[in-house]
């Protein structure tokens, strides 16, 4: 999955308009980013990237944090 594909998948999970999710968005700025959405996001990360949620991912507070962690693990491909 590409980085942009991950962002599109997050938009679907969070039920926000396409291309509206910004890297600075977080649980604080997206009302739909609930604990249930967290479970869906972590499920996506596990199924698409084979990355199990750990402390670093669980502590990620924004889209930017999630992207940074996934990039550091070489998860995205173009």
Regions found by a protein language model. Give the residues of each.
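Phosphopantetheine-dependent thiolation modules in NRPS/PKS and related acyl-activating systems
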Residues: 1-78
């Amino acid at each position: 999955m590409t980085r942009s594909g991950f962002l599109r998948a997050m938009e679907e999970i969070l039920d926000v308009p396409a291309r509206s999710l910004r890297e600075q968005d977080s649980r604080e700025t997206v009302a739909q980013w609930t604990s249930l959405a967290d479970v869906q996001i972590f499920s996506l990360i596990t199924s698409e990237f084979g990355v199990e949620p750990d402390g670093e991912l669980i502590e990620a507070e924004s889209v930017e944090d999630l992207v940074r962690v996934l990039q550091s693990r070489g998860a995205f491909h173009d």
